[in-house]
UniProtKB/Swiss-Prot annotation:
NCBIfam families: sfsA (TIGR00230). HAMAP family: SfsA. InterPro entries: SfsA (IPR005224), SfsA_C (IPR040452), SfsA_N (IPR041465). The gene is sfsA. This is Sugar fermentation stimulation protein homolog. Disulfide bonds: none annotated. GO terms for molecular function: DNA binding. PANTHER family: SUGAR FERMENTATION STIMULATION PROTEIN A. Pfam families: SfsA, SfsA_N. It comes from the Archaea. Belongs to the SfsA family.
Length: 240
């Protein structure tokens, strides 16, 4: 595995958050639990304090390396849901990987200027942020294999649509950034997951050729805080 030369990495964001900076803090207490089974995309049965509970999982990915019987997870109490708990993170490679996709845009906003718009309608979809002359779409990444972060871990038609919309915006003279939040700190570089979603991979590389900026940031969970670790580059391939 080779990293792309970091000098060629494009897509720097305007607000330079320092490495080691906390970008989110959970106010709820985090409890350790174990997975019994995944009921469906958004529901997981867990054991906690010797009892079984249903926990909400706010991440539609396959997560086969994270949500499986017996694996250790962190849960927190949540209000306004049918379940008492939400899954916050799952254990993998000696660390907890944050799984709650509701946090992605909150974290992304820490790297933006104060004046920005949210959820801007573009074509038949919505792009997460706009500031100045730039549109920015956020994607969360939890899959890491052999120090390479991969997105997506399940086919994503929505992700492909967002890339197409960003390309159309670039044709109209706007800047476009794809911000990838790797919610763990054991990746050294990033690649689109060609094996899982070859169509997304094609759209990804075509978008870069047409001027899409890509910014990839890694994070780690320390206590009840999500810490920004560092930016990582695209892995070196025959397409970079």
């Amino acid at each position: 595995m080779k990293e792309r030369d970091s000098r060629n990495q494009i897509g720097d964001l305007p607000f330079r958050v320092k490495e080691g900076f906390s970008v989110y803090e959970f106010i709820e207490q985090l409890y350790e639990a174990n997975v019994v089974e995944r009921i469906n995309r958004f529901l997981v049965k867990v054991t906690f304090n010797g009892k079984e509970f249903l926990a909400h999982l706010h991440d539609p990915g396959r997560l086969k390396d994270l949500i499986y019987p017996g694996n250790l997870v962190l849960i927190r109490e949540t209000k306004g849901y049918k379940t008492k708990f939400s899954i916050t993170a799952a254990y993998s490679n000696s660390r907890f990987v944050v799984l709650d996709s509701r946090l992605h845009n909150i974290i992304a906003s820490k790297f933006l200027p104060e004046a920005y718009e949210k959820e801007i309608k573009v074509g038949n979809s919505r792009i997460d942020f706009k500031y100045d002359n730039t549109y920015l779409e956020v994607k969360g990444c939890t899959l890491v294999e052999n120090e390479i972060a991969y997105f997506p871990d399940a086919p994503t038609e929505r992700g492909r649509t967002h890339l197409k919309e960003l390309r159309e915006l670039m044709k109209k003279g706007f800047n476009a950034i794809l911000l990838i939040l790797v919610m763990r700190d054991d990746a050294k570089c990033f690649l689109p997951n060609e094996k899982t979603d070859p169509k997304f991979s094609i759209e990804f590389w075509n978008s870069i050729k047409e001027g899409l900026n890509v910014n990839i940031k890694t994070f780690k969970l320390v206590g009840n805080k999500i810490i920004y670790v560092r930016d990582i580059p695209l892995c070196k391939t025959n397409l970079t």
